[in-house]
Amino acid sequence: MIKKASLLTACSVTAFSAWAQDTSPDTLVVTANRFEQPRSTVLAPTTVVTRQDIDRWQSTSVNDVLRRLPGVDITQNGGSGQLSSIFIRGTNASHVLVLIDGVRLNLAGVSGSADLSQFPIALVQRVEYIRGPRSAVYGSDAIGGVVNIITTRDHPGTEISAGWGSNSYQNYDVSTQQQLGDKTRVTLLGDYAHTHGYDVVAYGNTGTQAQPDNDGFLSKTLYGALEHNFTDVWSGFVRGYGYDNRTNYDAYYSPGLPLVDTRKLYSQSWDAGLRYNGELIKSQLITSYSHSKDYNYDPHYGRYDSSATLDEMKQYTVQWANNIIIGHGNIGAGVDWQKQSTAPGTAYVEDGYDQRNTGIYLTGLQQVGDFTFEGAGRSDDNSQFGRHGTWQTSAGWEFIEGYRFIASYGTSYKAPNLGQLYGTYGNPNLNPEKSKQWEGAFEGLTAGVNWRISGYRNDVSDLIDYDDHTLKYYNEGKARIKGVEATANFDTGPLTHTVSYDYVDARNAITDTPLLRRAKQQVKYQLDWQLYDFDWGITYQYLGTRYDKDYSSYPYQTVKMGGVSLWDLAVAYPVTSHLTVRGKIANLFDKDYETVYGYQTAGREYTLSGSYTF
């Protein structure tokens, strides 16, 4: 199941150590401060999802994994592969930092926000998810939270899997990890996924001409990694992956003109690293390169026709991070450099552009008696907007054994994307969007229930909005977000329960109107149990009311979208010690709902899959 953060500190063993759902030692996370540390020493709310969780849920997309997590609200323009957005604690989709193995997702650099509908679920071995500001560690984008997708496998062997389902869904996957001698490990993976999909547009809502077709999705993925331990403290790795996706979608149709309704995405990433893992000092140097080519075109004319568009971006990064144990805690420091380059025509920008950013940061964690203190500061020097600084601090007080109060404050920012700076309506004088956040939380273990309740406020200024009168982007928006988050997990006999509740009041601070596409309330519940070797799982999610715009006519009207309750049922059975079969019914009661106005969801879906390991 999802493993919620316990309160075990790195330097003392208290009653909190009983909170960890997995076995001791406490689960290690790397995302909070770039180095492995017990999850319980991170004062920000942190959730870890393992590959075992993903297999148990039988998720076929990254979005299906993330939608189950506290504070996450997913919207999507239809089914698999269709454009999606991630809202964390009511912030914008562009206020979520998505990392792949600790490196910023390349695709987010063009549009300003990450669309994880395109990222292959086959690559995901682990997800570390931190809520709240983290710009003081990572720089731009980390306003609402950080999602770190980790591709490294943690178990040797070979697995072959296949799956089939509704809308002609099919998936085939082969992966292997082999040990070469005592010090070298090789991992290889290949994956193929395809669905015919369904017609995503709900006609009459969008005003577009009917396009009665199936909006399908095809993805092909390759992955390889080589890891080597030179000595007991020195190690290195080389890793690469790529995917080739095709998505069909519904677009606005103009008679006599090409209908651009197909997306073709090529993406490849390569990284290499060297690590020193001493008893007191740790250091790592990581370099990476990624290249994406994103075509949108009419398949009757091809992706090289004048009607087609191409967004092409290359990203280069270098990260040097260091950590030293001092007293009852540690101090970390590092520098990272990033260069993003676009080809001419990307994001409708006539010329190609380079943007460089160099950041230096300092982090610290220290325990003093019943108190735990955490802090970080960072300075970024950007080739476009100059220097920008952020900082954050948190304190935890174990006022009674097994119970803790946490208070935190942090600043964060979001840099303008390349389209906002240099596009047809761009403004090269834009400043970063800025955020100030406060949070207070209580957490504890009561009668076997591991719980946390927190309240937060986030004031965002200098939001980049489009001005209809001047036809330019300006820093003129403000947002005020207030929220309450409650999480709990507990066991009752053979049943394991995980539940969360989110209340988010996200508003335009100038007009006092709700921000679009955010559900005001969400309830999420996961029930797992084993009966006669069958592993059962029930997932419940309530999505509250939200608002969106009807873009079928101008001026655009605000529409209210009602809430919905969704149920999933999953079951798995180990036929042998090597062969496991699984089945799932998503949207069990076939509820009709939308998360983006005018775009249909799939309705009830069935999947059947099997995996063989050796």
From Swiss-Prot:
The TBDR plug domain sits at: 38-152
InterPro entries reported in the protein's UniProt record: B12_transptr_BtuB (IPR010101), Plug_dom (IPR012910), Plug_dom_sf (IPR037066), TonB-dep_rcpt-like (IPR039426), TonB-dep_rcpt_b-brl (IPR000531), TonB_box_CS (IPR010916), TonB_rcpt_b-brl_sf (IPR036942), TonB_rcpt_CS (IPR010917)
UniProt GO molecular function: ABC-type vitamin B12 transporter activity; metal ion binding; porin activity
Coordinates of motif TonB box in the sequence? Answer: 26-33
Membrane topology note? Multi-pass membrane protein
Positions bound to cyanocob(III)alamin: L83, S85, N92, V110, S111, A251, T309, R517, Y551
Keywords (alphabetical) are: Calcium, Cell outer membrane, Ion transport, Membrane, Metal-binding, Porin, Signal, TonB box, Transmembrane, Transmembrane beta strand, Transport
The residues the record assigns to binding Ca(2+) 2 are D213, D215, Y249, D250, D261
Spell out where the chain crosses the membrane.
158-165, 169-178, 184-195, 217-227, 232-248, 263-277, 279-296, 309-325, 328-337, 353-369, 371-381, 385-400, 403-417, 434-443, 449-458, 473-490, 494-509, 517-529, 535-550, 558-572, 585-596, 602-614
The residues the record assigns to binding Ca(2+) 1 are D199, Q211, D213, D215, D250
A GO BP entry is:
monoatomic ion transport
Where found, per UniProt? Cell outer membrane
Where mainly found? membrane
Tell me where the sequence motif TonB C-terminal box sits in this chain: 597-614
Signal peptide, first to last residue: 1-20
What are the residue boundaries of the TBDR beta-barrel domain, all occurrences included? 155-614
Q: Does the keyword Membrane apply?
A: yes
Query: Under the cellular component aspect of Gene Ontology, which terms does the record hold?
Result: cell outer membrane; pore complex
So what does this one do? Involved in the active translocation of vitamin B12 (cyanocobalamin) across the outer membrane to the periplasmic space. It derives its energy for transport by interacting with the trans-periplasmic membrane protein TonB.
What is stated as this protein's family in its record? Answer: Belongs to the TonB-dependent receptor family. BtuB (TC 1.B.14.3.1) subfamily.
Stored PANTHER family:
COLICIN I RECEPTOR-RELATED (PTHR30069:SF53), TONB-DEPENDENT OUTER MEMBRANE RECEPTOR (PTHR30069)
Q: What is this protein called?
A: Vitamin B12 transporter BtuB
Recorded source organism is Escherichia coli O1:K1 / APEC
Organism placement in taxonomy = Bacteria, Pseudomonadati, Pseudomonadota, Gammaproteobacteria, Enterobacterales
